[in-house]
Design a protein with these regions (language model features):
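Gly/Ser/Thr-rich loops at beta-strand to alpha-helix junctions
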Residues: 94-95, 154-162, 185-188, 262-263, ...
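C-terminal functional extensions of proteins
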Residues: 204-254, 259-290, 295-364
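Gly-rich Lys/Arg/Thr-decorated short loops/hinges at beta-loop-alpha junctions or inter-strand turns
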Residues: 110-125, 222-226
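Active-site histidine-anchored catalytic micro-motif
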Residues: 150, 172, 177-223, 292
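Loop/turn positions that initiate beta-strands
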Residues: 83-91
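Glycine-rich phosphate/diphosphate-binding loops that line cofactor/substrate pockets in enzymes
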Residues: 135-150, 171, 247, 282-287
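Short acidic, glycine/serine/threonine-rich loops at helix termini
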Residues: 100-104, 162-167, 190-196, 266-269, ...
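Long terminal accessory regions outside catalytic cores
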Residues: 1-83
């Protein structure tokens, strides 16, 4: 099996319905963070806007945001970030009536029916066969390693298993990880595993509780705060394994978003939810593949800020692949209806998932 990137089919704007469509209307923002009445809200699909007779694509889109027309460019801006004077696109139709066109079928494959491998609106559960999904994902990762940007969104479950930590470390070291987004817990327990060989006080191989082990993650946080940064903590304590260690060693960017339940937190964790969301969106702006693992909150947040397409530097429009993996069917199904070429789901234990992928890619 060899991965081939689907071709994007742009709308034919020579058709009368596009030629006859009006230019988009805009209205200014009067109050910071408040969109004007009848603002247009974006989806994950490619959306075109008619400006001065030309249909323009909003290149860096996301769900549930406004479109600002600025110097002939279309900027997709979260409503909370709107500023007075911003010219916001108006209209709530999507077939050209308001100069707005939503293009949901840009990646169709001619000669293929809707049982295509990338049509995801179908039930998937623990009983689904995922052999083909793993094969497709591994081919995709081989392609993205060279041609794209793979961002991993991870919950703390990885840190509780020695094999999963080793597999993810190998993925980083072999170039399959270009960005990591997580919370305080993943980083804390991964560093705990490196320093004490425990996670929440349990040995990460035998799962046996260690004496006073419930102090271990708190000690890690305390020591890291004493060091002043995670990289300095790694150096000060001669950390030589784990997910966070490998990301730091290989200069893989990390975004750690805090929450109200965090201990500590570690230095570098972003405590302001909206600053964290902004940092996450900055990381996924040029991502071409996003893999979300065992974290419902971060998965939904990432899915909402990630469109189903990416515009490359040369103007090529390609699909953006999103995978969500969790042992809970409810979690993965939260993103199942985001659309074709948008979310692929696998219901499984994430420790087993990463080990299968790493072995399939022959990095362990």
């Amino acid at each position: 099996m060899s991965f081939k990137l689907p071709v994007y089919h742009a709308p034919d704007f020579s058709q009368p319905k596009f030629q006859d469509a009006p230019n988009v209307q805009t209205a200014p923002v009067l109050q910071a963070g408040v969109a004007p009445e009848n603002y247009h809200s974006t989806s994950m699909f490619p959306e075109y806007f008619k400006v001065n007779g030309q249909w323009l694509l909003a290149k860096e889109s996301r769900m549930d945001s406004s479109v600002v027309l600025q110097d002939g460019q279309l900027l997709v801006v979260e409503n909370r970030n709107l500023q007075p004077g911003d010219q916001v696109v108006l209209g709530r139709t999507e077939q050209g009536e308001d100069g707005i066109y939503l293009h949901a079928n840009g990646f169709y494959e001619e000669g293929r029916d809707h049982d295509d491998q990338f049509v995801f609106r179908q039930g998937r559960s623990r009983e689904t066969s995922y052999a083909r999904d793993y094969d497709e994902l591994m081919e995709l990762l081989r392609y993205e390693k060279v041609h794209g940007k793979v961002v991993w969104v991870m919950g703390p479950a990885f840190a509780f298993d020695s094999d999963a930590r080793a597999a993810m470390q190998a993925m980083v070291e072999n170039g399959y990880v270009h960005g990591l987004m997580a919370g305080n817990a993943l980083a804390t327990h991964d560093l705990e595993g490196a320093l004490f060989h425990t996670a929440l006080g349990q040995d990460i191989y035998t799962q046996r509780p260690q004496p006073n082990g419930h102090y271990n993650h708190l000690d890690v946080i305390n020591l890291a705060r004493q060091s002043g940064s995670i990289p300095q903590f790694i150096q000060d304590h001669n950390i030589q394994d784990g997910i966070i260690y490998s990301c730091v060693a290989h200069h893989v960017p990390i975004v750690l978003a805090g929450s109200i339940r965090d201990d500590g937190p570690l230095p570098g964790v972003i405590g302001d939810a909206y600053q964290a969301a902004g940092a996450m969106r900055d990381m996924v702006r040029d991502a071409t593949c996003v893999i979300c693992l065992a974290t419902m909150l971060h998965t939904i947040a990432t899915g909402n800020m990630t469109p189903c397409f990416r515009v490359l530097a040369d103007g090529t429009i390609r699909p953006l692949y999103i995978y969500t993996v969790d042992a809970d069917e409810f979690v993965v199904n939260k993103l199942l209806d985001r659309g074709s070429l948008s979310a692929k789901t696998i219901v499984t234990n994430v420790q087993d998932f990463i080990t299968i992928v790493a072995r399939g890619l022959k990095v362990i």
